[in-house]
A protein has these predicted regions:
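Short, low-complexity N-terminal intrinsically disordered segments enriched in polar/charged residues
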Residues: 1-27, 31-35
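Short helix-to-loop capping/linker segments positioned immediately adjacent to catalytic or ligand/cofactor-binding
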Residues: 5, 22-23, 67-70, 102
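Short, conserved clusters of charged catalytic residues that mark active-site
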Residues: 16-17, 77, 112
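A solvent-exposed, acidic/Ser-Thr-rich amphipathic alpha-helical stretch
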Residues: 30-95
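Outer-membrane beta-barrel domain signature
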Residues: 37, 43, 100, 136-137
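Beta-strand elements of well-folded, non-transmembrane domains
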Residues: 95-101, 119
Length: 137
């Protein structure tokens, strides 16, 4: 997948989308996280299953929050690549994930996100996001 497509503005907006994804999840701003997805957006992972549409994504935020058990999560996104075709884009990146509680790392995971993005009302959003686990770090 080449990452040299689209305008500079598109490229920066997509990078910002990825940063906001991590920031909103890690800081428990789930309503803002939901707004990063299209109305028919989906999220899928081995651990949490597949969640589709606004109601499904809202359910995911509750399940995810409860899974933390008070721990602080950190999503570190790297190696972002994407190809833009008009108002759609295919993208992938690496995820380094950890969560800590009482000063100790309780979980550390390495994964790959595979995404379909769509521009809606002038903003890039996730149409679908799939988490592909590499294993435990």
């Amino acid at each position: 997948m080449a990452n040299f497509s689209g305008t500079i503005e598109d490229r920066e907006e997509i990078r910002d989308l990825y940063a906001r994804y991590a920031d909103t999840l890690d800081n428990h701003r789930y309503n803002e996280w939901l707004d990063l997805f299209t109305d028919d957006g989906s999220f899928e992972s081995t651990r949490f299953g597949k969640h589709e549409g606004r109601a499904g994504l809202e359910k995911f935020t509750r399940v995810y929050r409860d899974s933390l058990g008070g721990a602080q999560a950190r999503h570190v996104i790297t190696n972002l690549l994407f190809t833009i075709d008009g108002d759609a884009a295919d993208a992938s990146c690496y995820l380094l994930y950890s969560h800590c509680k009482e000063g100790r790392v309780q979980q550390s995971t390495v994964a790959n996100y595979r995404d379909k993005l769509r521009r809606v009302d002038g903003r890039w959003r996730y149409q679908s996001r799939k988490v592909c686990m590499d294993g435990r770090a």
